[in-house]
Curated annotation (Swiss-Prot):
A GO BP annotation: L-proline biosynthetic process
Molecular-function annotations in GO: ATP binding; glutamate 5-kinase activity; RNA binding
Function comment: Catalyzes the transfer of a phosphate group to glutamate to form L-glutamate 5-phosphate.
Name this protein carries in UniProt: Glutamate 5-kinase
Length: 378
């Protein structure tokens, strides 16, 4: 462990996923804390003004639902938790919409499940939507879709969701705001000798031994889930900060490089992590052959693959599948995530994007494989 806090990580981060827990957005379980949410939105607006992109992952739906339904304690029955989530999600979305608009920002509600991110096509659709929202200057507010998936309530948590979203959008950093000042060497509520861990590697096995214990009765995650979330986020190159959410101007100060909380540093660079994931960990579902001009652009300019440069399409693949890209000699030169299924790819092969709507009945991405989802293999 080191106490040399690498503040440059957050200072230089341009795309940030911020996760706030139930204890920070509710009045001790008695509905949403309007003042607290307003403060988060004010800080987010300052980050956006500083040319940063921010995605919120917010807990609080079940707690708000409990308040609206008049329940004093968190229920244990799945259907009651689902009902509370459904009722509370209305208030949560309305509160963020109001407070973000007061700060000059648009908002969008996005409800996800782990299944959405496990399916390649839905993963790519969710990614495209979120990146479009960020490009439009809108702040996505994400929560798990607890109402429709039983095991999300039983075993899921928004710390994990925050990490998955960081992977999804290739965020530079994940900020987990909680009711603790960070990770301590032991539980500070039980051990007076416990000290704050200022910085560590996200994959350090000693971290899990330090974490442990459960959270409050309002949320589902304890410190261990935050450590595991940081480890998951590091898979796509995102470092994680775990910090006390009641720290004044926490988000703004972190973005300025202040040493707050615990920094868990990713050991893999963002681009390297994604390229490795595409190149090594997904089974090829098909291939496309490209002409000499497309080959030159892919190799020499790092361009996206456009359908007009394709000569043939082989195999049966879906949107989001990994496909090989071959030159005219049949040699694989790259691979990447397909934006179009094989049936559609055959229709737009050798065609400019201006004809896609006429050929397919809709207009989507102009690229067959976007350069962000493409890795050269030769």
């Amino acid at each position: 462990m080191t106490k040399n806090f690498a503040s440059v990580v957050l200072r230089d981060a341009r795309r940030i996923v911020v996760k706030v827990g139930s204890s920070l957005v509710t009045n001790e379980g008695r509905g949403l804390d309007e003042t607290a949410i307003g403060e988060w939105c004010r800080q987010i607006a300052l980050l956006v003004q500083d040319k940063r992109e921010v995605i919120m992952v917010s807990s609080g739906a079940v707690a708000e639902g409990m308040k609206r339904l008049g329940w004093a304690t968190r229920p244990h029955l799945i259907h009651e938790l689902q009902a509370a989530a459904a009722v509370g999600q209305m208030g949560l979305a309305q509160m963020y919409e109001t407070k973000l608009r007061e700060n000059g920002l648009g908002s969008a509600q996005v409800l996800l499940t782990h299944a959405d991110l496990a399916d390649r096509e839905r993963y790519l659709n969710a990614r495209s939507t979120l990146l479009t929202l960020l490009k439009l200057g809108v702040v996505p507010v994400i929560n798990e879709n607890d109402t429709v998936v039983n095991d999300e309530i039983k075993f899921g948590d928004n710390d994990t969701l925050g990490a998955l979203v960081a992977n999804l959008v290739e965020a530079d950093a994940l900020v987990i705001l909680t009711d603790q000042k960070g990770l301590f060497t032991a539980d500070p509520r039980k051990d007076s000798s416990a000290t704050l861990v200022h910085e560590a590697k996200s994959g350090d096995p000693a971290l899990e031994a330090m974490a442990g214990g459960a959270g409050s009765n309002l949320g589902r995650g304890g410190m261990i889930t935050k450590i595991l979330a940081a480890k998951r986020a590091a898979g796509s190159g995102a470092s994680t900060v775990i910090a006390w959410g009641r720290e004044p101007d926490a988000l703004v100060r972190l973005s300025q490089g202040d040493a707050i909380g615990t920094l868990l540093v990713a050991q893999t660079q963002k681009t390297q992590a994604r390229k490795q994931w595409i190149a090594d960990h997904l089974q090829l579902r098909g291939s496309v052959t490209v002409d000499a001009g497309a080959t030159q652009k892919l190799r020499g300019q790092g361009s996206s693959l456009l359908p007009i440069g394709m000569t043939t399409v082989d195999g049966d693949f879906s949107r989001g599948d990994v496909i090989a890209i071959r030159d005219l000699q049949g040699v694989e030169i790259a691979r990447g995530l397909a934006n179009y299924a094989s049936v559609e790819a055959r229709l737009i092969c050798r065609k400019p994007s201006t004809e896609f709507e006429k050929l397919l009945g809709y207009a989507a991405e102009p690229e067959m494989v976007h350069r962000d989802n493409l890795v050269l293999t030769r």
